Amino acid sequence: MAQVINTNSLSLITQNNINKNQSALSSSIERLSSGLRINSAKDDAAGQAIANRFTSNIKGLTQAARNANDGISVAQTTEGALSEINNNLQRVRELTVQATTGTNSESDLSSIQDEIKSRLDEIDRVSGQTQFNGVNVLAKNGSMKIQVGANDNQTITIDLKQIDAKTLGLDGFSVKNNDTVTTSAPVTAFGATTTNNIKLTGITLSTEAATDTGGTNPASIEGVYTDNGNDYYAKITGGDNDGKYYAVTVANDGTVTMATGATANATVTDANTTKATTITSGGTPVQIDNTAGSATANLGAVSLVKLQDSKGNDTDTYALKDTNGNLYAADVNETTGAVSVKTITYTDSSGAASSPTAVKLGGDDGKTEVVDIDGKTYDSADLNGGNLQTGLTAGGEALTAVANGKTTDPLKALDDAIASVDKFRSSLGAVQNRLDSAVTNLNNTTTNLSEAQSRIQDADYATEVSNMSKAQIIQQAGNSVLAKANQVPQQVLSLLQG
């Protein structure tokens, strides 16, 4: 080896080794201080990618476990409300058993029915107000998906149902008969009295009525109309004033005579969907029904409505609306425009049949047993929505209370309702157990993944402490050797001194 001064190769080699050892010492100190074997991708690129995927799974599964616990809380909240609904149903059943014995008076039954109604109202309140984090859990049918995994479509569904008196089949539930039928004064709701209605049959037309007082050609009267039972109008056909309406007088024997000085001061308008003729004088609609023997009506509107029974069968009928807003079932002749009130008969709790009675729409559910409507038999307890209620009798009397509102087979109805609640509670119990199992599995999976991640990225302190100690010793030795290497060029001076 040449003796040189400018380049100390031994010192350079020693410095390089010291730098390498310094890097190893720094890595060991970093791992020991962070606890991680992989502090950056340069430590282990593949290991860093694997560990990062584990981190995503672990965090996702941890949140999924929290989601599942929330799902358990939803099911518990819902079941708690159902438990209270069940308590109310059991009380209603107890009261119903009490009501079915024959020793109860009408007053007793009324008291029992009041508590039953209160219990059913409470069921409706619980159904409408039970919430979890702002979500109504018993107010409507639906489902709630609980995310129980770290990836897409890893869910458990909680089925929710609307549970109230209506869905339980207890809407209008009653343990007593409405067996008192009262009547009001003669009906004026149709804008016409029920006596002395003008009918086309049996009317004798006088000679004077055959000719318009202001015309010269022969004319005849097509019909006579009234809006209040006192003032009458006649429609003229033929002659100079064909199609016009004039005031007339009607004698007790049915003779119709043109009123003195009568003028055609009435206009004709169309009455909605019925194609019937309405006389309007001064903005007041008058009688439009020119059918012999039919009740007359001061109509606000006639429209087609649909009734649906519990089996989903539809029945179409016309709804006749009077000036008070009451709706009555009606028949409409599309050709003549004639509107007549549809009548029914019904049987009260004593078994007595009523006289023909007009059908009023919009009554309370389960209040009327309808024997016959256009040849079809219905029990209004089976009706859904617009139930039937008697309103106007053929004799002109309005029924304000209707018979036979007692629920058929009430205990069976309650047993069915309780069974429905039990079935829902069973499904909630099953989903609670499933979610609880999911939480256990998620926790186990999270533990195993965390251990796997630890083996990849965590520092082994025994190894790293050993590596650090080794690097420190080498560092100290390197520093000592470097001092010796730096003194080698001085040996060349001895050659110069000689």
Swiss-Prot record:
A molecular function (GO) term: structural molecule activity
Keyword line: Bacterial flagellum, Secreted
Disulfide bonds: none
Secreted is among the record's keywords: yes
Compartments where found: Secreted; Bacterial flagellum
GO cellular component, one term: bacterial-type flagellum
Family: Belongs to the bacterial flagellin family.
Functional description taken from the UniProt entry: Flagellin is the subunit protein which polymerizes to form the filaments of bacterial flagella.
UniProt protein name: Flagellin
